[in-house]
C-alpha cells in the first residue's frame, strides 16, 4: 500500500508543485481545496484552477467549504489583518486545522503546503510559519517541500518517511525555479499568485468593514452581495445596492427572493435597487431618485419607479449627500 499525504491545493503553482514533489517520493496525495464566499470563483460551476492542476498531476481533490466559522474568523482574527482585510495567518491556521482532520482520517503522517519562505511578508516569514503550525496543532507535521531545505526538519524527515535531500530550498518572491519545475512536470492551468481572494481587494474590504459595523450576523449571501453593484447607506443605517449593468441587475433580481425589497425603473432603462429595511415614503423617494441619477434616460422626461405592485414618481434626482446617502466602497 502506498504511503498517503494530504496537500493544500489552492490552484496556484506553488501548492501543486509541493504536492508533485511529494508524489515523486512515492506518496499518494489527497488534495484539499477550500472555498468560501471570499473566493472570486465561489459558487461558479466552471472548473477552478485547483481542479485543473490536480488533474494534471493525477491526484484526487476534495472541495471543502470553510462555511460560517470562517466568516466569524474574518471579523476578529487573532493575528490581525494584512494590507486590507485579509487575515492571512488566521486563514492558513483555519485551513490547516481542517486539513488535520483529513490527515487523521486517512492515516497520513503529515500535511503538505506550497508555502515559500519569505515570499509573502505577513504569512510566510520564518517566525510566522512556526506560529501557524503551532496554532494549527501540527507542530512538526507540516511539510513545505519548496523551502524544506531552509527550514528545520519535520517529523517525517526525522523518521525517514521523506528524503530531505530531494526537497527544495526556494525562498523569496522570484518564481524562476517554480516555472522551470512546472515545465518539467508538465503542469498547466494554474492561477496567478494571490489572484483569487476578495479580502485583498481595497474596494471589497471597505464594503466588508461597513457590513461588519452594521450587522451582527453575516451569512454567505450577505458576502456575495458585496461583490455586486454600487453600495450606499442611509444616515439611519439602511443600505441600498444598485446594479451597474444588465448582468448585475439580474443578480439583484434573483437575490430579491431572499427577503430583500426590489425597486425597478418602470418604462425606461436603468439600474434596479435592492433594499433591506422598512420602505417608508421618504426612503422610497430617495431610492427612486437614486435609480434615476444612475439611469441613462435624458433629463426632463417623466420617469417612474416600480416597487411591487406600486408605481410612483420620485421626483427629480438630487445630489447623493442631500438625500442622506453615503457611498460605500472605492468603485462607483
Regions found by a protein language model. Name each.
Residues 141-332:
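AMP-forming adenylation/ATP pyrophosphatase catalytic core
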Residues 1-184, 328-332:
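ATP-dependent adenylation/nucleotidyltransferase module used to activate substrates
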Amino acid at each position: 500500500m502506498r504511503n498517503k499525504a494530504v496537500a493544500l491545493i489552492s490552484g496556484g503553482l506553488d501548492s501543486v508543485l509541493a504536492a508533485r514533489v511529494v508524489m515523486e517520493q512515492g506518496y499518494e496525495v489527497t488534495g484539499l481545496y477550500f472555498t468560501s464566499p471570499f473566493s472570486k470563483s465561489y459558487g461558479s460551476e466552471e472548473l477552478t484552477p485547483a481542479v485543473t492542476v490536480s488533474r494534471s498531476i493525477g491526484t484526487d481533490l476534495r472541495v471543502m467549504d470553510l462555511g460560517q466559522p470562517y466568516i466569524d474568523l474574518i471579523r476578529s482574527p487573532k493575528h490581525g489583518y494584512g494590507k486590507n482585510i485579509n487575515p492571512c495567518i488566521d486563514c492558513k491556521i483555519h485551513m490547516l486545522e481542517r486539513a488535520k482532520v483529513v490527515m487523521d482520517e486517512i492515516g497520513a503522517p503529515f500535511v503538505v503546503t506550497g508555502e515559500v519562505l519569505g515570499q509573502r511578508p505577513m504569512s510566510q516569514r520564518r517566525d510566522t510559519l512556526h506560529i501557524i503550525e503551532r496554532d494549527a496543532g501540527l507542530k512538526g507535521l507540516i511539510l513545505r517541500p519548496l523551502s524544506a531545505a531552509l527550514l528545520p526538519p519535520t517529523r517525517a524527515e526525522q523518521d525517514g518517511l521523506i528524503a530531505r535531500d530531494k526537497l527544495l530550498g526556494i525562498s523569496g518572491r522570484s518564481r524562476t525555479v517554480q516555472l522551470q519545475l512546472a515545465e518539467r512536470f508538465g503542469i498547466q492551468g494554474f492561477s496567478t499568485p494571490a489572484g483569487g481572494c476578495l479580502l485583498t481587494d481595497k474596494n471589497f474590504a471597505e464594503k466588508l468593514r461597513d457590513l461588519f459595523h452594521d450587522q451582527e450576523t453575516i451569512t454567505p449571501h450577505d458576502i456575495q452581495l458585496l461583490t455586486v453593484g454600487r453600495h450606499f447607506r442611509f444616515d439611519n443605517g439602511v443600505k441600498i445596492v444598485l446594479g451597474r449593468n444588465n448582468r448585475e441587475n439580474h443578480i439583484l433580481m434573483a437575490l430579491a427572493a431572499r427577503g430583500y425589497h426590489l425597486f425597478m425603473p418602470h418604462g425606461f432603462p436603468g439600474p434596479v435597487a435592492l433594499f433591506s429595511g422598512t420602505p417608508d415614503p421618504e426612503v422610497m423617494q430617495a431610492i427612486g431618485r437614486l435609480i434615476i441619477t444612475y439611469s441613462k434616460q435624458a433629463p426632463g422626461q417623466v420617469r417612474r419607479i416600480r416597487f411591487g405592485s406600486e408605481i410612483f414618481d420620485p421626483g427629480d434626482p438630487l445630489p447623493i449627500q442631500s438625500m442622506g446617502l453615503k457611498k460605500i466602497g472605492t468603485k462607483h
